[in-house]
Amino acid sequence: MQMNSLNDPKHLVKAVVRGEIKCLDVRAQSKYEISHLRKSVNIPSEKISKCWYQLPAKQEELFVVEDQGDKIETEETGTCAQQLKKRGWNIAGHFMFSHKIWEDLSLPQNELLESGPNRNLLFEPCPYLKEVMPVVEKGIKTNNARVLDIGCGSGRDLAWICFRESGKHWMVSALDAEKRAIQRFSELFSGLGLEDRIEGKKVAKVDASGLWKLYTRDGKQEPNATAISLADMLADFQNVPEGDVYKYDLVLQIRFLNRALLRQSSSLLRNNGFLFLCTFVNDGVHQYEHPRGSDHRFEKGEAAAIVSESDGRIRVLKDEIGFIEDGRPVQILLAQKVE
């Protein structure tokens, strides 16, 4: 048994179980499912190089559990924890898994270990989405809820919505202009056992007028494709309840900006449905370089004005300025379509 940590080993292990420190277990899935630390997350070492987006933010403390010989990159020296530290992750400690370790630490196995598949996530969603979800789920009248993420990226926000225990059964649809993003979204949902929550996913790009062009899974534009409306595109999604194809309980636009599309928000929402937006803004105080131009930044108060003027049934519940990790300001908007 080997134990390496920057702090007291008992403290670190107990902190993992209490949910105070994230824990990455890089052992083979079969070994993980036999026995692992409570609240740890399994990504086998050979898969990590394709799953960076599933790791926590680099500044967060991370505890690593591994077997002798586990490596992220076979040509590199060092353990997985050491290889992660080289890449900038904040490694609080690590150990080589062994049942003898609990004897060495005088810790009770039955309180710290569990078996079975992964039940946790290493990453966090957009913090402002996490903040408003209790309001959203309280305001939605159905337990079978539907969410559309426009500009979904790797799908982490959607995965977080579905993976936690909330009393709502969320079905998801995902759009992104990048084929790699949709591939990652698919891989993430597959790895978490959430494939049956996907109603639809598409590689599609929207122009300034709000019209869309579809692309194949290879990232090539569909042959003979013409620009189509959002409604026409969503009509092609699979696993969508008949007669309910265009309506969602929650629409997400996170680090995505299209004013024409924002004006269509009401047409996408069920009664009592919510729009959540978090994207870059000129707040009149902070100066930053990227992204540049009005195509990628709202003016302060602009987003709220657009959705309010588009339909009198849209009620703005939150209109605030927030900040992402590097200090750049973002517009935070939560709006609801009232009956």
Curated annotation (Swiss-Prot):
Residues 17-111 form the Rhodanese domain. GO terms for molecular function: methyltransferase activity. GO terms for cellular component: cytosol; nucleus. InterPro entries: Rhodanese-like_dom, Rhodanese-like_dom_sf, SAM-dependent_MTases_sf. It comes from the Eukaryota. Transmembrane segments: none annotated. Gene3D superfamilies: Rhodanese-like domain, Vaccinia Virus protein VP39. This is Uncharacterized protein UNK4.09.
